[in-house]
Amino acid sequence: MAREREGRRRDDREERDSEFVDKLVHINRVAKVVKGGRRFGFAALVVVGDQKGRVGFGHGKAREVPEAIRKATEAAKRGLIRVSLREGRTLHHDVNGRHGAGKVILRAAPQGTGIIAGGPMRAVFETLGMQDVVAKSLGSSNPYNLVRATFDALKNEDSPRSVAARRGLKVSALQARRRDADPADTSDAAVA
């Protein structure tokens, strides 16, 4: 009976893990100086997401590359955030983020644009499930800073529902205001 329960738990864990897509962003060889010389190890930066609006990143260090990647993947799964996507494909509005000397600008894009982003940011958007976005990185090109700056920007993004709740309005009133402000945008789907 106990074995059966343990087997079921393992199956549930494997099923939960299989829903995530992980991307290795950066691997770095690090050295620890000890009395007898240098002891080498590896540091890995991994981004994990379910391609449905949840994404996380993790950092892992170990003596061997696969172990560092495994640790980073586990850390990423522990730190998942949920991002609200417009029409399930892009951002609701433009956002900026920064971490250290790394700055990123993320812009919502029309359908069919694709992911226009470099290096570490592309991995974040692909695992998040975003299909259309234009991103620009400024300052530091360090992958750790860029991933953290991208996450800072994604955390600053608000859905129309959360903005309406904060202002004490209905979502339809908020969308009506947006249509009044932008005469070129007359579609209801553009603000969904």
Curated annotation (Swiss-Prot):
GO cellular component, one term: small ribosomal subunit
PROSITE patterns in UniProt: RIBOSOMAL_S5 (PS00585), S5_DSRBD (PS50881)
Key words, A-Z: Ribonucleoprotein, Ribosomal protein, RNA-binding, rRNA-binding
GO biological process: translation
Pfam annotation, one family: Ribosomal_S5_C
GO molecular function, one term: rRNA binding
Xref: InterPro entries: Ribosomal_Su5_D2-typ_SF (IPR020568), Ribosomal_uS5 (IPR000851), Ribosomal_uS5_bac-type (IPR005712), Ribosomal_uS5_C (IPR005324), Ribosomal_uS5_N (IPR013810), Ribosomal_uS5_N_CS (IPR018192), Ribsml_uS5_D2-typ_fold_subgr (IPR014721)
Location of the S5 DRBM domain: 20-83
Region named Disordered: 162-192
Gene3D superfamilies with a match to the protein in the record: 3.30.160.20, 3.30.230.10
Alphabetized NCBIfam families for the sequence: rpsE_bact (TIGR01021)
Quaternary state and interactors: Part of the 30S ribosomal subunit. Contacts proteins S4 and S8.
PANTHER family linked: MITOCHONDRIAL RIBOSOMAL PROTEIN S5 (PTHR48277:SF1)
HAMAP family to which the protein is assigned, alphabetical: Ribosomal_uS5_B
Free-text function comment from the UniProt entry: With S4 and S12 plays an important role in translational accuracy.
Record text about domains: The N-terminal domain interacts with the head of the 30S subunit; the C-terminal domain interacts with the body and contacts protein S4. The interaction surface between S4 and S5 is involved in control of translational fidelity.
Family: Belongs to the universal ribosomal protein uS5 family.
Protein name from the UniProt record: Small ribosomal subunit protein uS5
Organism (species): Methylorubrum populi (strain ATCC BAA-705 / NCIMB 13946 / BJ001)
